[in-house]
Amino acid sequence: MPCPVLELTQQLIKRPSLSPDDAGCQALIAARLQALGFTIEQMSFGDTLNFWAWRGQGSTLAFAGHTDVVPAGDLQLWDNPPFEPTLCDGMLYGRGAADMKGSLAAMVVAAERFVAQHPQHEGRLAFLITSDEEADAQDGTVKVVDALMARQERLDYCLVGEPSSSRQVGDIVKNGRRGSLTANLVVQGVQGHVAYPHLADNPFHRAMAALKELVETQWDEGNSFFPPTTMQIANIHAGTGSNNVIPGELLVQFNFRFSTELTDVIIRQRVEALLQHHGLRYRIDWSLSGQPFLTARGELVDAAVRAVEHYQELTPRLETTGGTSDGRFIARLGAQVVELGPVNATIHKVNECVSAADLQLLSRMYQRIMEQLIL
C-alpha cells in the first residue's frame, strides 16, 4: 500500500534545495496546504523563500521547518546519488531525508488527515517554513518572526521538526536549547625577527596564559534543565608561514554554548575582564547566534510526551543539548516550543537516511499532538 508520507518525502528529496535555494519544495508543500483551506502568505527576504500558512482561528499550534539542506559533499562516497531518493531495506536514503524533509512530509500528511477528520476544528493550525536554516539563517525564520511580532500575531505552541531522536523515533524531545555566542579575538603584538625577540612582542606567547585560563574556567554549573556552559576554541591563527618571523597578531575564535544561568552580557564582561587582567592589547568582536530558551512542562510538552508514549511504548527524555535551531527565534513570540523529529544518526553525513516506518510513526505523533491541542 502506498505511504503518503514516504511519497512526499521522496518528492522533496528530488528537489536539490541547497541552502538557501528552495528548488520548488515550498511550492509543493504550499499547494498541499492550500488544498486543505490554508491561507498561504509568502514572506520572502533576499534569496530566501519563507511562507506562513494558517487555517482556523483561536489558540494556535504551528509546525515549523526548513526545506534547505547542506551540500552532499563528495558524490563518489554516496552509494546512490544524494538527490535520487532510494528505498533499501526499509530505509530511505537521500540528502535531507532526516534533516528535515521527512519531518516536513510527516507534518503535511498529519495536517491532511487531521483536517479530513476534523474539518471544523476549534483552534488554528499553522505552518512556518523557510529555506534558510542550514546556512546563514539571516533571512529565514528570524525575519518571519520579526514580521509576526510587528503585527502582534498570536502563537501559543510550536513544534519544530528537527531530528531530535537518538536511537528510536521519539526517544528524545527537545524542550529548549542552549544559547550560542562566538568571539573573534585579535591579540596585538609587534612583528619581528625570531633571532631578535627583544625587538618584537610575540602575541602568541603573551596570550597563552589568558587562553589557558579561558579554557579552564568553569562558567557555571548548569541547572536541572541545562548542562554547564561550555567554551571551545574553534580556530586559531598567527604568523606569515615563515619560520623566522614573529607574528604581529594572533587571531582566536571561540564559542560559548551557554545555559540560562548566564546571559551573553555576563559572558562578554567576564571574558573582557580576564583579557584585561592579563594585560593584553586586543580587540574583540562578538556574534550572538541565539539566546537560550526553555519550555517547561505544560500543554505542549505533555502533548508531545503522550503522543510518543501512545505509539512507541516509551517515555521520551526531555533534553536541551545539541546545536541551535530555529526554535530560538520562535520562542521570542512567547510560544511554547518543542522539537520532535526523526533519528539524527546520519544527518549531514554521506548516505543520510531515515526509516520509512519512522516517518509514518512521526506523522501519527504529529496528528495526535494536533488533536490534543486544537480540538
Swiss-Prot record:
Active-site residues (renumbered): 68, 133 (proton acceptor)
Gene: dapE
Subunit description: Homodimer.
Entries under PANTHER family matching the protein: ACETYLORNITHINE DEACETYLASE (PTHR43808), N-ACETYL-L-CITRULLINE DEACETYLASE (PTHR43808:SF31)
Top-rank EC class of the record's enzyme: hydrolase
Protein name: Succinyl-diaminopimelate desuccinylase
GO biological process: diaminopimelate biosynthetic process; L-arginine biosynthetic process; lysine biosynthetic process via diaminopimelate
Cofactor(s) the record lists: Zn(2+); Co(2+)
Record-stated family: Belongs to the peptidase M20A family. DapE subfamily.
List of residues binding Zn(2+) 2: 99, 134, 348
The protein's annotated pathway: Amino-acid biosynthesis; L-lysine biosynthesis via DAP pathway; LL-2,6-diaminopimelate from (S)-tetrahydrodipicolinate (succinylase route): step 3/3
EC assignment: 3.5.1.18
Annotated Zn(2+) 1 binding sites: 66, 99, 162
Coiled coil, from the record: none
Catalysed transformations (reactions): N-succinyl-(2S,6S)-2,6-diaminopimelate + H2O = (2S,6S)-2,6-diaminopimelate + succinate
Note on how the cofactor is bound: Binds 2 Zn(2+) or Co(2+) ions per subunit.
Lineage top rank: taxon: Bacteria
Natural source organism: Sodalis glossinidius (strain morsitans)
InterPro entries xref list: ArgE/DapE_CS (IPR001261), Bact_exopeptidase_dim_dom (IPR036264), DapE_proteobac (IPR005941), Peptidase_M20 (IPR002933), Peptidase_M20_dimer (IPR011650), Peptidase_M20A (IPR050072)
Function comment: Catalyzes the hydrolysis of N-succinyl-L,L-diaminopimelic acid (SDAP), forming succinate and LL-2,6-diaminopimelate (DAP), an intermediate involved in the bacterial biosynthesis of lysine and meso-diaminopimelic acid, an essential component of bacterial cell walls.
Keywords: Amino-acid biosynthesis, Cobalt, Diaminopimelate biosynthesis, Hydrolase, Lysine biosynthesis, Metal-binding, Zinc
GO MF, one example: succinyl-diaminopimelate desuccinylase activity
